[in-house]
Design a protein with these regions (language model features):
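Ferredoxin-reductase
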Residues: 1-128, 187-189
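FNR/FR-type flavoprotein reductase catalytic core
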Residues: 68, 98-190
């Protein structure tokens, strides 16, 4: 792990450098899988608040995220779309939204008594220098790059990861300037 910082209240930009000598050839729009080991964690003790950032901490405190605990009893894998594009080097960038339990129905307050997401919780505990096991690339969400037809991307929240990869590849690697491209992005406000 070389970086794991919040880029929005509940979204991390998680960047992993591949081991020396390793290279991943992929088409923008692909995804990678990350191994999630067995673990127990307490959000208050195990999530590095400095990696959330001062800008986002008040919302985490307001919504009671630091009261959450998570336990994964069986090793598993989860798939995340890669936000990086090939020219960014031998690294994998994921955008990960913390998967919190749903809120209690009113008039109750707080979260329902179910576990938060096991993969997002694990990823939110990782710090620069930590080692993770990942595999890939996988998937077939690949646009036709050599067409003249308009490209329209629609995404929201952390789901914009593969769209970033495709847009950056088209504009920075292929230097496409004569093809109409539209990007529509939606995000929740607090």
């Amino acid at each position: 792990v070389i970086s794991n910082r919040n880029v929005a209240t509940f979204i991390k930009e998680f960047i992993v450098k591949l081991p020396e000598g390793e290279h991943m050839n992929f088409i923008p729009g692909s995804y990678a899988q990350i191994r999630i080991p067995e673990y127990e964690m307490d959000y208050d003790k195990d999530i590095d608040k400095s990696l959330i950032g001062d800008e986002y901490l008040p919302a985490w405190e307001k919504f009671g995220l630091f009261t959450l605990k998570c336990r994964n009893t069986e090793e598993t894998v989860r798939a995340y779309s890669m936000a990086n594009y090939p020219a960014e080097g031998d690294r994998i960038m994921l955008t990960v939204r913390i998967a919190t339990p749903p809120f209690q129905p009113k008039p109750k307050t707080g979260f329902m008594p179910v576990s938060p997401g096991i993969a997002s919780s694990y990823i939110f505990t990782l710090k620069p220098g930590d080692m993770v096991l990942m595999s890939g690339p996988y998937g077939d969400f690949h646009p036709i790059f050599d067409s003249k037809a308009e490209m329209i991307w629609v995404g929201g929240g952390a789901g914009m990861a593969p769209l970033r990869s495709q847009i950056m590849y088209m504009t920075r690697t292929l230097h496409v300037t004569d093809r109409k491209m539209s990007f529509f992005y939606g995000a929740r406000a607090l």
